[in-house]
Swiss-Prot record:
Catalyzes a salvage reaction resulting in the formation of AMP, that is energically less costly than de novo synthesis. This is Adenine phosphoribosyltransferase. SUPFAM superfamilies: PRTase-like (SSF53271). It is found in: Cytoplasm. PANTHER family: ADENINE PHOSPHORIBOSYLTRANSFERASE. GO terms for biological process: adenine salvage; AMP salvage; purine ribonucleoside salvage. It comes from the Bacteria. Gene3D superfamilies: 3.40.50.2020. One of its GO terms (molecular function) is adenine binding. Signal peptide: none annotated. It is an enzyme of class 2 (transferase).
Length: 181
C-alpha cells in the first residue's frame, strides 16, 4: 500500500458532523464509491493483500460490506456470501443476535452458503465496535467455516472493535483509520 493510494482513498471519504445524531462524526463511504479511482484503488489494495491466501469464500455484511466484498470475491475468483438482517434471505438460514449501543440486532446467513472447511474472508466498510463482525464470525464458524481474517476500508480505533475481533482470533486489516466516533 502506497501512501499516495491510501491518501487518495482516505480523502475520498466525506465526514458528516452530527449524523445520524448529534455528537457523531459519520464517515460516509458512499463518497468513496462515487470516485471511480478511489473505489478501484480500494478493491485493488484488498486484492493485492488477499490474493494468495487461499480463500474459498468472501462474506460481506449488510449492506455496505456487499459493495466491497462482492467485487473482491470476483477478483479473487471465489464465491460471495451476503450476511443480512432477518427475513431478507429466501433459503433456510441460521441467525446470530448481537448487542448494539441501544438494543439488540440479528444477522442471518443461508445454511448452505458455507460448507465445512471453507476458508472465509469477512469484509465490511467500517469497523467500530466489532459487534456485527463478531456475530458474522460466529455464524460462519457454526456452519464449519474457517475465518481468521477480517478486512475493512475504515477503522475507528478509539472505539476498540479491532481489539474485540482480535480476541476472537481474527487478523484485522483496515485501509485507513479515522479519529473519533
Amino acid at each position: 500500500m502506497t501512501t499516495e493510494t491510501i491518501s487518495l482513498i482516505k480523502s475520498s471519504i466525506k465526514s458528516i458532523q452530527d449524523y445520524p445524531k448529534p455528537g457523531i462524526l459519520f464517515r460516509d463511504v458512499t463518497s468513496l464509491l462515487e470516485d471511480a479511482k478511489a473505489y478501484q484503488a480500494t478493491i485493488g489494495l484488498l486484492v493485492e493483500r488477499y490474493k494468495d491466501m487461499g480463500f474459498t469464500k468472501v462474506v460481506g455484511t449488510e449492506a455496505r460490506g456487499f459493495l466491497f466484498g462482492a467485487p473482491l470475491a470476483l477478483e479473487l475468483g471465489v464465491g460471495f456470501v451476503p450476511v443480512r438482517k432477518p427475513g431478507k434471505l429466501p433459503r433456510p438460514t441460521i441467525a446470530q443476535s448481537y448487542e448494539l449501543e441501544y438494543g439488540i440486532d440479528t444477522l442471518e446467513i443461508h445454511t448452505d452458503a458455507i460448507v465445512e472447511g471453507d476458508k472465509v474472508l469477512v469484509v465490511d466498510d467500517l469497523l467500530a465496535t466489532g459487534g456485527t463482525i463478531e456475530a458474522t464470525t460466529k455464524l460462519i464458524r457454526q456452519l464449519g467455516g474457517e475465518v481468521e481474517h477480517a478486512a475493512f476500508v475504515i477503522n475507528l480505533p478509539e472505539i476498540g472493535g479491532d481489539k474485540r475481533l482480535e480476541a476472537l482470533g481474527l487478523n484485522v486489516f483496515s485501509i485507513c483509520d479515522f479519529e473519533g466516533h
